[in-house]
Amino acid sequence: MELNFLWLILAIFLGTYVVLFGFLRKVNDWYYVSRLGEKKKSLPPGDMGWPLLGNMLSFIRAFQSSDPDAFVYNLVDRYGRTGVYKSHMFWSPSIVVTTPETCRRVLMDNEQFGRGNPESTKELLGKKTLALSNEEHKRLRKLTTNPFRGDKALTMYVGYIEDIVVDLLDEWAGMKKPIVFLFEMRKLAFKVIGHIVFGTTSDHLLELMEQYYTDLLLGLRSPAINIPGFAFYRALKARKLLVKLLQDVLEERKKMVGIEQQKGNRGMIDLLIEAEDENGKKLADENIIDLLIINLLAGHESSAHASMWAALYLYQHPEMLQKAKEEQEQILKRRPSTQKGLTLEEIKQMDYLAKVIDETMRRTSLFIPIFREAKVDTDINGYTVPKGWQVLVWTRGVHMDPEVHPNPKEFDPSRWDNRAKPGSYIPFGGGPWICPGADLTKLEIYIFLHYFLLYYKLELQNPDCPVAYLPVPRPSDNCIGKVIKVKNF
């Protein structure tokens, strides 16, 4: 009798679990999909996950494992290689695009796809600035892009970046204790972008800002929960401190406008202060500060991580390391005896290093997709993308797709011997909102690797350290090691 009663309880429990499980898995479908009416029939394959959380649990589980690409591979295994899937990601109904063709379509089509960001990103980077009209965005983009692009701009920065790299490498080599290589690379990159944005400012101020950016980055893709203990709470506090610092710098710069001594130390901040629209209206301080926050963030993360990973990959592949070194040695041999330091023309001759950098950026793609939003009901590959849904350009899905890049987990610079298929390499996005600092990022990596490969080596404290993928791919110890000088300049 007691045994039958236990079986009854177990059956009720299992039945309740199955019914509840099935009900909860359908809530998002009912809420977001059913309201679309006839359009729901032409939605791409996929599922909407759990209420509120959507598919974030399976996403986080994949990126906390040793196989972060399992998230996209699972979509392909379950629903086929459609290149477009419905989901619920980052707390919104979403369309995930994962092939070169679908990603390129979304990135290039400014008429049907606008900028889209999670609420946390809008709060932390500035709602008003992210919501600017297309025309206003184009005007400001031109203003903030000019300091980063073109041979004239890049030539101006070669010597400055070179000085920072040489000084810091020498400083690291002189340290008795191991350094946290990734953290030091971030400081290096932040010094560079700080010079471009401010023209000149104190090292202490840049160090403070770099510390605040660490918390800001962690909160960008977190749920907008402003409660102590959550990443967004810390990030919001960091933003407030950044805004205060930048407001002080802005006020000081406004006092310096037109002063002769200041003209040699101009940065992006001065261009933004002086900018006017067709009616002579200047930018509000709030917009200027938001633009500074965005450009400082974008200007140091990518170059720091890519520089670290390029060095690690080369040391893991001695034959590639030797080939990269020989290329740099040849550049020195061709250099006139009267020339001091690198030139942009020499950097353009680094063909093999260019492939190393491209392969590094492919192999270590961030987990964060590129966010867009459908402006109108539109069609991709015969599937409906509903107006207002966010569209996630899954760059890592493209970069780690074995049908696009054979043996994608292998580090193989030779895969770039041939021209890449359009849309198959998108570390900086594409279309109207392509990252304006792409050329500067690569310039920093070239200069760092040139000096590092010729004159230094890295001895890792934990050479078999596992890789962590959240919030960015990195050795779980953040690459602790000693930088050792092996040759004098």
From Swiss-Prot:
Mainly expressed in petioles. One of its GO terms (biological process) is sterol metabolic process. It is found in: Membrane. Its EC number is 1.14.14.-. Signal peptide: none annotated. Keywords: Heme, Iron, Membrane, Metal-binding, Oxidoreductase, Transmembrane, Transmembrane helix. The keyword tRNA-binding does not apply. Its cofactor is heme. Heme binds at C435. Its main location: membrane. It catalyses: melianol + reduced [NADPH--hemoprotein reductase] + O2 = 7,8-epoxymelianol + oxidized [NADPH--hemoprotein reductase] + H2O + H(+). One of its GO terms (molecular function) is heme binding. InterPro entries: Cyt_P450 (IPR001128), Cyt_P450_E_grp-I (IPR002401), Cyt_P450_sf (IPR036396). It is an enzyme of class 1 (oxidoreductase). Gene3D superfamilies: Cytochrome P450. Pathway: Secondary metabolite biosynthesis; terpenoid biosynthesis. The chain crosses the membrane at residues 3-23. It comes from the Eukaryota. It is a single-pass membrane protein. GO terms for cellular component: endoplasmic reticulum; membrane. Belongs to the cytochrome P450 family. Monooxygenase involved in the biosynthesis of limonoids triterpene natural products such as azadirachtin, an antifeedant widely used as bioinsecticide, and possessing many medicinal applications including anti-tumoral, anti-malarial, anti-rheumatic, antibacterial, anti-inflammatory, anti-pyretic and diuretic effects. Catalyzes the epoxidation of melianol to produce 7,8-epoxymelianol. PANTHER family: CYTOCHROME P450 26 (PTHR24286), CYTOCHROME P450 88D6 (PTHR24286:SF199). This is 7,8-epoxymelianol synthase CYP88A108. It comes from Melia azedarach (Chinaberry tree).
